[in-house]
């Protein structure tokens, strides 16, 4: 059997098991309502938390940047690809995050790849929450460090693993956790993690992709939310969710950022963000710096939708953020529920095994500051209608 036939067989297996990903194409900009294949639907599955992906200020900033700086950076950051606008973004992000310095890279995924293998190796131990993001898992693999996986949000389990790492005489101990876990919307027990890190002389790294622009003062993230900015050694952020653009960043002490500029492969061997992306991200940072109006609107919407859907009889688990997992449990019924939502004009994705454990299938609803009360009421009415028709209510 040749290579391509093998690929066809693998794709067929995915299709037969119901795991083949279907990619829908948007025919409009991101917004509360979007067009997909000629159909107008309420968007309840994007990460556009604050509605900045099609914001006029960001678009104007991007257009002006193209006029002034061109469309591409032309090189990697260390040769001729660092423009003044890149440094302006990094400075503003550092001010916003209340840290000494930041480093912007091509994506949040790349940010984890830039940090983890650069600061750890075979002599070190990495303590990772079992539900951490794929980019963390891959970064840990690349580092070749010893792995100590602790049970999700279980501080007793973390301490047990720290004791093991200490017995193994690890040179460095790096605790890594997501800030907000994207499937359930729960947040990391950061105060307890920091306390254990001090006790066992470990570093703390938080990937706050879903916390940036959502938690903390003006959306500064989970470290600010818990007033622990000084205690967290490394924060990873993304510019593609609440910030509405694309890219990732690393926030921390200047010496860390200086070291990453010398050694981090994703920084050294990839071109920098385009001027348009950089300018738009800078404008998004300014908007968050200036006002918390969008963050407040996001939370008002989330609290309204979550309270109403719980009153309806749905289980939304232990979410602590606008991420709302509407539990259906049964895989087949969850997929059918998602299809019926789409027929009724709502785009909300089904999350099933293996993304989540068997029997934990859900519709993951992503609330945005762009949603109006009428939008949310429309969605609630459809959840009630479909729930009754499928017997999930």
From Swiss-Prot:
It comes from the Bacteria. Signal peptide: none annotated. Its EC number is 2.3.1.47. Pyridoxal 5'-phosphate binds at residues 108-109, 182, 207-210, 238-241. GO terms for molecular function: 8-amino-7-oxononanoate synthase activity; glycine C-acetyltransferase activity; pyridoxal phosphate binding. It catalyses: 6-carboxyhexanoyl-[ACP] + L-alanine + H(+) = (8S)-8-amino-7-oxononanoate + holo-[ACP] + CO2. One of its GO terms (biological process) is biotin biosynthetic process. It is an enzyme of class 2 (transferase). Keywords: Acyltransferase, Biotin biosynthesis, Pyridoxal phosphate, Transferase. Pathway: Cofactor biosynthesis; biotin biosynthesis. Its cofactor is pyridoxal 5'-phosphate. Homodimer. Belongs to the class-II pyridoxal-phosphate-dependent aminotransferase family. BioF subfamily. NCBIfam families: bioF, gly_Cac_T_rel, PRK06939.1. This is 8-amino-7-oxononanoate synthase.
């Amino acid at each position: 059997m040749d290579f391509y036939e093998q690929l066809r067989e693998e794709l067929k297996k995915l299709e037969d098991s119901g795991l083949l990903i279907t990619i829908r194409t948007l025919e409009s900009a991101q917004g509360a309502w979007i067009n997909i294949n000629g159909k107008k639907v309420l968007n309840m599955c994007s990460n556009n938390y604050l509605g900045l992906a099609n914001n006029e200020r960001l678009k104007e900033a991007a257009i002006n940047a193209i006029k002034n700086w061109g469309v591409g950076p032309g090189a990697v950051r260390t040769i001729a690809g660092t423009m003044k606008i890149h440094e302006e973004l990094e400075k503003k992000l550092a001010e916003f995050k209340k840290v000494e310095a930041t480093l912007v890279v091509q994506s949040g995924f790349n940010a984890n790849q830039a940090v983890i293998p650069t600061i750890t190796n075979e002599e070190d131990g990495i303590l990772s929450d079992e539900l951490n993001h794929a980019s963390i898992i891959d970064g840990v693999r690349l580092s070749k460090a010893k792995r100590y996986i602790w049970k999700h949000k279980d501080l007793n389990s973390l301490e047990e693993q720290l004791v093991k790492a200490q017995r193994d005489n690890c040179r460095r101990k790096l605790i890594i956790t997501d800030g907000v876990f994207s499937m359930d919307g729960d947040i990391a027990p950061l105060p307890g993690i920091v306390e254990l890190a001090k006790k066992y002389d470990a570093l703390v790294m938080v990937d706050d992709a879903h916390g940036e622009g959502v938690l903390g003062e003006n959306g500064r993230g989970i470290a600010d939310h818990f007033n622990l900015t000084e205690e967290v050694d490394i924060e990873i952020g993304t510019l593609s969710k609440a910030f509405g653009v694309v890219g990732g960043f690393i926030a921390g002490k200047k010496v860390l950022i200086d070291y990453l500029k010398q050694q981090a492969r994703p920084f050294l061997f990839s071109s920098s963000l385009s001027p348009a992306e950089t300018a738009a991200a800078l404008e998004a940072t300014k908007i968050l710096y200036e006002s918390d109006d969008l963050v407040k609107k996001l939370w008002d919407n989330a609290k309204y939708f979550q309270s109403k859907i719980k009153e309806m009889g749905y289980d939304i688990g232990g979410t602590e953020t606008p991420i709302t997992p509407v539990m259906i449990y049964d895989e087949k019924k969850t997929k059918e529920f998602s299809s019926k939502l789409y027929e009724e004009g709502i785009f909300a994705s089904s999350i099933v095994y293996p993304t989540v454990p068997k029997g934990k299938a859900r519709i993951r609803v992503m609330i945005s500051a762009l949603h109006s009360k009428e939008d949310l009421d429309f969605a609630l009415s459809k959840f009630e209608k479909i729930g009754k028709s499928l017997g999930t209510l």
